[in-house]
Regions:
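Long, highly hydrophobic alpha-helical transmembrane signal-anchor segments
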Residues: 1-24
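Transmembrane-helix bundle segments that line or gate the permeation/cavity pathway
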Residues: 24, 28-31, 35-39, 89, ...
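Membrane-interface amphipathic/juxtamembrane segments adjacent to transmembrane helices
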Residues: 28-71
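Loop-to-transmembrane boundary segments
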Residues: 68-90
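Membrane-helix interface motif
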Residues: 96-109
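Interfacial loop-to-helix junctions that mark the boundaries of transmembrane helices
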Residues: 112-119
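Structural signature of hydrophobic alpha-helical transmembrane segments
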Residues: 119-125
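Conserved small/polar residues in nucleotide/adenosyl-binding loops
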Residues: 134-141
Length: 144
């Protein structure tokens, strides 16, 4: 019975990860298309970089892009961050279920290195943290 629970958990988390990834890619494509369609306008504030008029579902939208925050921020602001967050969180959950849950099957080759499952998991997490830290430090020192 526990095997079925494990398999269903993997399948559900895998689909959540796929759907979150598709949402993230979709919103990224939307903003690429939005940036490419921006046009300058005479009636725009000086802080604005451009505007794009769009139509969807019978409604018209006037999108204005600011390169810096406008002087007066709206009370409610829509953040497009949860697509990326949910992809990352579901990916970590999937990695934990598939690889860390079955570390002896996927992560350990006794002919190469005789380690326990816990050691394999900590080596993996240590590698992820090291690569992430190195990547962040490289971007802090580089100039864009």
């Amino acid at each position: 019975m526990l095997d079925y629970f494990w398999l269903w958990s993997e399948m559900i988390v895998r689909w959540v990860h796929v759907i979150a990834g598709v949402a993230w890619i979709g919103s990224s494509f939307y903003f690429i298309a939005l940036d490419l369609s921006l046009k300058p306008g005479k009636e725009l504030p000086k802080e604005a970089n451009g505007q794009a008029w769009q139509v969807h579902g019978g409604g018209f939208y006037n999108m204005v892009k600011y390169l810096v925050a406008p002087k007066k921020m709206p009370e409610e602001l829509t953040w497009f961050k949860w697509e990326a967050y949910s992809t990352w969180i579901s990916g970590m959950a999937l990695m934990s279920l598939v690889y860390y849950g079955s570390a002896s099957l996927y992560m350990i080759d006794l002919e190469v290195l005789d380690i326990t499952q816990l050691q394999a998991v900590f080596l993996s997490l240590g590698g992820i943290v090291t690569v992430s830290y190195t990547h962040l430090r490289a971007h802090e020192t580089s100039s864009y």
